[in-house]
């Protein structure tokens, strides 16, 4: 009987630990879209809101249809709009990463195949947590 109770407790403990570990990298995305570039232009921008329940840094974003994808910020400095590359932007439980027109955004360089309105593209995001664990997630972005 004691052995049976011990097995039940071990099983419950395992379930609790699993839910903590698997819930730690919960990452949600909304409003994910890529702007359809004008004809002849091989660069465009992407936008989304990314939320998580833990502290993370964005290390990389990629897709085979683009030579390079970077995260950029935009801000007005002395009346001039400046765009700068963001290095390892952070997000957390109370601080989502908001990528929006005229603000932080994705810059997608070197379009290899023409984008079509309404098409879905999978962008691969690589995150790192506070313990340096790598988390790789694919998110769907619609071209519009």
Question: Would you name each region that the model predicts?
Answer:
Residues 23:
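Pyridoxal 5′-phosphate
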């Amino acid at each position: 009987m004691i052995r049976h109770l011990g097995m039940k407790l071990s099983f419950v403990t395992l379930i609790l630990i699993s839910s903590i570990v698997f819930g730690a990298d919960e990452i949600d995305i909304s409003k994910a879209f890529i702007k359809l570039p004008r004809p002849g232009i091989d660069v465009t921008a992407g936008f989304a809101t990314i939320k998580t329940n833990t502290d993370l840094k964005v290390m990389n974003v990629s897709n085979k249809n683009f030579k390079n994808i970077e995260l950029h910020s935009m801000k007005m400095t002395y009346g001039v709009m400046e765009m700068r590359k963001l290095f390892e932007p952070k997000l957390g439980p109370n601080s989502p990463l908001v990528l929006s027109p005229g603000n932080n955004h994705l810059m997608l360089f070197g379009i290899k195949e023409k984008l079509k309105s309404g098409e879905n593209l999978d962008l691969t995001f690589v995150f790192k947590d506070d313990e340096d664990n790598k988390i790789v997630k694919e998110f769907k972005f619609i071209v519009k």
